[in-house]
Amino acid sequence: MTDSEYSSAADAVANLVRRVPGFPSEGVVFEDLTPVLADAGAFRLIVDELAEAARSYHADIIGGLDARGFLLGSAVAYQLGLGILAVRKEGKLPPPVFHRGYDLEYGHAALEIPREGLNIQGKNIVLIDDVLATGGTLCASRALLEEAGANVAGLAVILEVEALEGRKRLADLPLTVVGERSE
């Protein structure tokens, strides 16, 4: 087990996140979690908190959103003894797929999951991502999973950009936010 110099996951996020104004476009402040995830103690604290959220939402499967949600979701799924479903960016999976477009804080994108080979009907899936901004990514992921017959039981992220009000689009779902945005 790795000890941490931080008292909590929120403390680790507050001290390690790197904020980059103007990236990837003017007016956006990019929340770079690379230093947070690279710190073993901070990573453990974050995964522990995300796992507790997923446990409390009665997850059967963890849904990890492309790309940092893969890192977080895999660690959480492993800790809980669950499977991980990678919700992929458009064009990364062979057909047939469930497909959903959405708007980002700084553009447009689409997500996909396989249409065949999954047994997720009626399963409780907890979606894990790095940042909740506009809510577009999580809403699109939810729509994909519900179209496939799954139940999205809850959401867990490291950071929330409150000014973009993504939480409002997902108000009917339980949400865990590990860290607080300082700006």
UniProtKB/Swiss-Prot annotation:
Functional pathway: Purine metabolism; AMP biosynthesis via salvage pathway; AMP from adenine: step 1/1
Superkingdom of origin: Bacteria
Catalytic activity: AMP + diphosphate = 5-phospho-alpha-D-ribose 1-diphosphate + adenine
GO CC field: cytoplasm
Any one GO BP annotation for this protein: adenine salvage
Gene Ontology molecular function: adenine binding; adenine phosphoribosyltransferase activity; AMP binding
Known EC number: 2.4.2.7
Spans through the membrane: none
Subunit details: Homodimer.
HAMAP family: Aden_phosphoribosyltr (MF_00004)
Function, as annotated: Catalyzes a salvage reaction resulting in the formation of AMP, that is energically less costly than de novo synthesis.
Family to which the UniProt record says this protein belongs: Belongs to the purine/pyrimidine phosphoribosyltransferase family.
Protein name: Adenine phosphoribosyltransferase
